[in-house]
Amino acid sequence: MDPISAVDAGQVRFDEVVDVVVVGLGAAGATATVAACQAGADVLSIERSTVPGGTSAGSGGLIYLGGGTPLQVACGFDDTPQNMAAFLHGALGPGVDENRIDAYCEGSCEHYDWLVSVGVPFRAAFCDEPNRESPDDAGLVFSGGEDSYPFDEAAVPVPRGHKPQYIDSAGGFLMERLGAAVAKSPARVVPDARAESLVVDDGEVVGVLVNVDDHSRAIRARGGVVLAAGGFIHNEAMVAEHCPLAHVPDAAWRIGTPNDDGRGIRMGVGAGAATTRLDVFECALPLGPPHRLARGILVNRQGRRFINEDTYTGRIGAHALRDQDGFVYMITDDVIYEPNILGLRIAFAATTPEELALDLDVPPEALARTLHDYNEAAARGSDPEFHKRAPFLRPIGVAPATGIGAIDLRVDHGAIYATFTLGGLVTDTDGAALDITGRRVRGLYAAGRTAASLAAHHYASGISLGDGTFFGRRAGRDAAMHARR
C-alpha cells in the first residue's frame, strides 16, 4: 500500500476554518455529521460523488443492534448487552477488539433510540427467513448464525438484524433518512469533492486538502477530520497485496462503489495512523431463500463436508473461499431441492454417489462414505460431526427421492461469492485513529470501512452499518468536543 503523505501546515494557506470536517457521506459519515452538529460543532462534510450514500445506499440496510432494543422486546425476544457480547466475541473472531465490542453492545439500545430520533423507523415484526433482509418491511431477523452451532451454545440465540421499515432492501431508504437528518442539520455539504491529503501540525491532523471543480482548497478543522471514505475492495493493487482471494471473478460481487478504493485508509496512514487486518474480508455464499436448501450438504474437493449448512451464509462463504479454494458443491436430491430466489439449480444428477462423484471430479469412495455417514445420522435426527439442527436433517437420495444431484457452487463457475474488505485504520471506542504504539493520532478519526471493522475474522450481516453508524456518531461527537478544548 502506498500511503498518501500528509502535508505540513506550514506549507498551507487555509481557505476556510471549521470545527469538524467529515470525509464521505455514507452511513458512517452521515451519522458523524449529525452527531457533530448536535454537539454544537460547525461541520463541513465532503462527498466524492454527486449523490451521497456510498456503499450503504446499495446495501440491504441491516443494522446489527441488540442488548434489548425496543424492536427486540416488541417482537418477543429477550436480550442483554452481555448476551450480545458473548455472541460477537465468538462469532467475529478470533482477534476481536474486546473494548470496542463491549462499548458497542453496552451502547446498542441507546444507538437504536438515536436512529429512531433522527428519522429511521423500524416495524415491530420478525422475519423467520434468516441471513438477509426481509422481503417485506419486517424489522427483525437472525443475521449472523446466532441460532446455529456453535454460537447457539455460547449465547442465547436472539435475532439482531434490524432493518428500517421498507420493502425488501432498505439501504437506499436508510440513506434517505440519514441524508434528511444531515440536510436538517446546520452542516454544509459539498458534493463532487475529493479529499487529496490531510494537513498536519506537529503530528496533529489540523485539516484537509480538498479538490473541488479542479481547484484545491485547504480546510482547517479545529476539532478534527473524520475519515468515512469506504474500504478498498475496488483498489486492485491493495486487494492483490493484502487479500487476493477477495478479488472474485465476477466484479459485480465485489461489494462497493468505485470510490471504495482505499483512499481514506491511505490518507490516514500518511498522517501516522496504524492499520490492522487488511487481509480480512467478508465473503457471503448465499444458499437461499428458502433456508430449507440447507437440508442438503456442502462438500469440498475431497468429497467431504466442512461446515454445518444451516449456519450464516457469510460464514459458509468465508470457509468455502478461504479454506476450500472455492471448490464446493451442494449435494441434494429431487425431494429436498426446491426453487429458490437465486435460481440455484441441480447441475449434475445420478443414481448413486459414486456416479455423481465422477461428474464432480471428487473421490467416489469419499463422497459415498460422506453420504452414508450423514444419512445414517440424519435418520436418527442428529449430526454429530457438524451439529446441524434437526429441522435441516433429512437423508439424501433415499425414497421417495429418485437419485441424488449436485448444485455447482464453485467460485469460477458462476456461484455468488460476494466480498468486501473489513480491515482498515485502527481506532478506539470513540472512533479516534491510533498509531502503531496505540496512542491517538490527534485530530484524526475514522469510521465505516475506512476503520477496521468489529469483525476481526468472521462477519455477521449488519455489522458494517452497525459499527459504522455507532462509531461514526462517537467520532463526530468526540471531534466536536475536541474543537472546544
List each model region and its residues.
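A glycine-rich dinucleotide-binding beta-alpha-beta segment and adjacent secondary-structure elements
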Residues: 197, 368-458
